[in-house]
C-alpha cells in the first residue's frame, strides 16, 4: 500500500510540473507576441509620422507608383460636372497633374481644398474612377443680385456671399444697394420672382437702416416697403401694374410702410 501511495504522489507531482511548464511557455509566447505587436506599431508610427526611414518610404512609394502606372493605373481622363462659371483650365491647373501621371499619386483632399478656394465653388467632390479617370463634381454658387457698397459692385449669392467683381455677364440681375443689402437680397429676390412683370420694372432695391427696402422702379417711381411682411405690398404694386395703373399716373412715391394706410405722392 505504501509503494502505491508513493507512486501516485510522483505522478501527481509530474503532472503539476508539466502544467506549470505549459503555463510558463504560454505566458512567454503571449509576451513575445505582445512585444512584436508593440514593436510593429512603433515601426509603423516612425515610418508614417516621422522623418525616420524617409528614404525607404520615398523609395517604396516611387516603386509602387511606377508599378501601378505600368499596370494602367495612370491619369488619362478628367470628367468635370457642374461647371458653369469656373473655366476648365483653372480646374486642371489645381489638379496639377499631366496625362500619364500615376493616378494614385494624386492627393484628392488637397485638390478639393484648393478648388474650394475659388469663390465660385461652394462645394466639390473629387474621386478616382479606376483605372485611369479623375471625376470632379462642382457645386457652384448662383449669383442672384449685384450688390453696390462703398462705390464697389459685387455678385452675391442667396447667402450674401461675395462671389466676384466681374458683373458684366449678369446685367439682368437686380441691383441691391446699401449696408446689409447682400444678406437680405435672397429673400427680396425670392418674393419679386413671384411677380416677373414687376421685377422687370425694378431697376434697384435700396436697403435703408438695415431694416427695410425702397424699390426704385423704371420711370423714377419709388416704392417704400414695410420692414416686415412686405409680401402684401408687393402684391398690391403688382396688381396696379397689371391693371395699367402704375406707370401712367405720374406717381413719384408709393409709401406702403403702413399696411393700414398707403400714401401716394405724384410729380
Swiss-Prot record:
Membrane association type? Single-pass type II membrane protein
Short name of one Pfam family:
FtsQ_DivIB_C
Stated family: Belongs to the FtsQ/DivIB family. FtsQ subfamily.
PROSITE patterns recorded: POTRA (PS51779)
- This chain's protein is named Cell division protein FtsQ
Q: Where in the cell is it found?
A: Cell inner membrane
Domain POTRA span(s) in chain numbering: 73-141
Please indicate the ranges of residues that lie on the Periplasmic side. 54-267
What domain of life?
Bacteria
* Principal location: membrane
Residue ranges crossing the lipid bilayer per the database entry: 33-53
Q: Which UniProt keywords apply?
A: Cell cycle, Cell division, Cell inner membrane, Cell membrane, Membrane, Transmembrane, Transmembrane helix
Q: Does the keyword Zinc apply?
A: no
Q: Which residues lie on this side of the membrane: Cytoplasmic?
A: 1-32
Give the function comment from the record. Answer: Essential cell division protein.
Q: From its record, what is one biological process in GO terms?
A: cell septum assembly
Gene3D superfamilies to which the protein is assigned, alphabetical: membrane protein fhac
A GO cellular component term found in this entry reads: plasma membrane
The record's listing under InterPro entries reads: Cell_div_FtsQ/DivIB_C (IPR005548), FtsQ (IPR026579), POTRA (IPR034746), POTRA_FtsQ_type (IPR013685)
Amino acid at each position: 500500500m505504501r509503494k502505491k501511495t508513493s507512486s501516485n504522489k510522483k505522478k501527481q507531482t509530474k503532472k503539476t510540473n508539466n502544467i506549470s511548464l505549459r503555463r510558463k511557455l504560454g505566458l512567454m509566447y503571449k509576451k513575445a507576441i505582445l512585444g512584436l505587436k508593440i514593436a510593429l506599431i512603433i515601426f509603423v508610427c516612425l515610418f508614417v509620422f516621422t522623418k525616420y526611414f524617409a528614404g525607404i518610404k520615398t523609395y517604396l512609394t516611387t516603386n509602387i507608383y511606377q508599378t501601378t502606372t505600368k499596370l494602367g493605373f495612370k491619369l488619362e481622363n478628367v470628367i468635370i460636372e457642374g461647371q458653369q462659371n469656373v473655366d476648365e483650365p483653372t480646374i486642371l491647373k489645381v489638379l496639377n497633374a499631366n496625362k500619364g501621371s500615376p493616378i494614385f499619386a494624386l492627393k484628392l483632399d488637397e485638390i478639393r481644398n484648393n478648388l474650394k478656394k475659388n469663390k465660385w465653388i461652394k462645394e466639390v467632390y473629387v474621386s478616382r474612377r479606376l483605372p485611369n479617370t479623375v471625376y470632379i463634381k462642382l457645386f457652384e454658387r448662383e449669383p442672384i443680385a449685384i450688390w453696390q457698397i462703398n462705390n464697389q459692385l459685387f455678385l452675391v449669392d442667396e447667402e450674401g456671399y461675395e462671389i466676384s467683381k466681374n458683373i458684366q455677364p449678369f446685367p439682368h440681375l437686380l441691383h441691391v444697394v446699401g449696408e446689409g443689402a447682400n444678406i437680405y437680397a435672397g429673400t427680396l429676390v425670392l418674393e419679386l420672382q413671384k411677380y416677373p412683370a414687376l421685377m422687370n420694372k425694378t431697376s434697384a432695391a435700396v436697403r435703408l437702416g438695415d431694416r427695410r427696402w425702397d424699390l426704385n422702379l423704371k420711370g423714377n417711381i419709388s416704392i417704400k416697403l414695410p420692414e416686415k411682411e412686405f409680401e402684401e405690398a408687393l402684391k398690391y404694386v403688382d396688381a396696379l401694374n397689371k391693371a395699367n395703373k402704375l406707370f401712367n399716373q405720374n406717381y413719384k412715391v408709393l409709401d406702403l410702410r403702413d399696411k393700414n394706410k398707403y400714401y401716394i405722392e405724384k410729380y
